[in-house]
Amino acid sequence: MATNRTFTMIKPDAVANGHIGNILAMITNGGFKIVSLKLTQLTVADAKAFYAVHAERPFYGELVEFMSRGPIVAAILEKDNAVEDFRTLIGATNPAEAAEGTIRKAYATSIGENAVHGSDSDENAAIESAFHFAGREQF
């Protein structure tokens, strides 16, 4: 398996609850190298653009409001099989269904406030990384 990259965000709920350090520790302990990292806040327009794929879904408005209500931590991670391995590390969207030892089992409070985002494909990882990090911010 080739080394590749994935994108993650620590969402506003986890940031507000003081879980940044613990989540980053789980990520690095999971064998991921953090190659880009920043604390930022999405505007409503940013959140709408980032989640445009969900625009027709009934939860879209709540998602946009949630993701723009406070700071997030955006990161690009590197590891062999990065996308799939990170999806395993974060766990199921519903924290009640997430496996023990996953980020969402430890830090998510609900399906809507599930602590972290992880790219679902190599293609989306590249798109999502470029959305948050200018070329010279990607190392």
UniProtKB/Swiss-Prot annotation:
Record lineage: Bacteria, Pseudomonadati, Bacteroidota, Flavobacteriia, Flavobacteriales
Organism name: Flavobacterium johnsoniae (strain ATCC 17061 / DSM 2064 / JCM 8514 / BCRC 14874 / CCUG 350202 / NBRC 14942 / NCIMB 11054 / UW101)
Localization, UniProt: Cytoplasm
Function text: Major role in the synthesis of nucleoside triphosphates other than ATP. The ATP gamma phosphate is transferred to the NDP beta phosphate via a ping-pong mechanism, using a phosphorylated active-site intermediate.
Primary residence: cytoplasm
UniProt EC number: 2.7.4.6
Active site: H117
Necessary cofactors: Mg(2+)
Enzyme class: transferase
Protein family: Belongs to the NDK family.
Protein keywords: ATP-binding, Cytoplasm, Kinase, Magnesium, Metal-binding, Nucleotide metabolism, Nucleotide-binding, Phosphoprotein, Transferase
Swiss-Prot/TrEMBL GO biological process terms: CTP biosynthetic process; GTP biosynthetic process; UTP biosynthetic process
Assembly, per entry: Homotetramer.
Entry keyword Cytoplasm: yes
GO cellular component: cytoplasm
Residues engaged in binding ATP: K11, F59, R87, T93, R104, N114
GO MF term list: ATP binding; metal ion binding; nucleoside diphosphate kinase activity
Catalytic activity of the protein: a 2'-deoxyribonucleoside 5'-diphosphate + ATP = a 2'-deoxyribonucleoside 5'-triphosphate + ADP; a ribonucleoside 5'-diphosphate + ATP = a ribonucleoside 5'-triphosphate + ADP
This protein's name: Nucleoside diphosphate kinase
Record's signal peptide: none
A Pfam family annotated for this UniProt entry: NDK
PANTHER family: NUCLEOSIDE DIPHOSPHATE KINASE, NUCLEOSIDE DIPHOSPHATE KINASE DDB_G0292928-RELATED
